[in-house]
């Protein structure tokens, strides 16, 4: 099932769509945010604008969060904070066997 306006694979591959994982949750102390893999940076920025906050994220709102971070992530804040991926506190991942694991730097 191709996804319009997205990078797609041919009919022999498996496409995992994460668009339903769109949760956004700011920590109580407002120092970290939980971002679901279905979000694009525009959604993250819009959510954080209500708190007058931002993140070391993508430079274009239509860019997906997971692909950007897994690719390193060049941000407008790169000179001050480095690559966006270096600012990730934790990844929660589902392994091929169904186990859920948390990975931290």
Identify what each model region corresponds to.
Residues 4-8, 26-27, 104-105:
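Short, solvent-exposed loop/turn and secondary-structure capping segments
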Residues 11-12, 50-54, 99:
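Loop/turn elements at helix/coil->beta-strand transitions in domains of secreted/extracellular proteins
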Residues 13-17, 33-36, 55-57, 92:
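Structural recognition of the beta-strand scaffold that forms the well-ordered cores
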Residues 31-32, 39-44, 62-64:
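Short, structural beta-strand-to-alpha-helix junction motif
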């Amino acid at each position: 099932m191709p996804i319009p306006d997205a990078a797609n694979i041919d009919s022999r591959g498996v496409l995992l769509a994460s668009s339903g994982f769109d949760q956004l949750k700011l920590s109580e102390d407002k120092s970290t945010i939980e971002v679901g893999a279905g979000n694009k940076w525009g959604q993250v920025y819009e959510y954080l604008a209500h708190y007058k906050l931002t993140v070391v994220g993508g430079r274009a709102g239509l860019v997906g969060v997971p692909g950007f971070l897994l690719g390193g992530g060049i941000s407008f804040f790169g000179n001050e904070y480095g690559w966006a991926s270096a600012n990730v506190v934790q990844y929660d991942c589902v392994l091929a066997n169904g186990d859920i694991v948390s990975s931290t730097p």
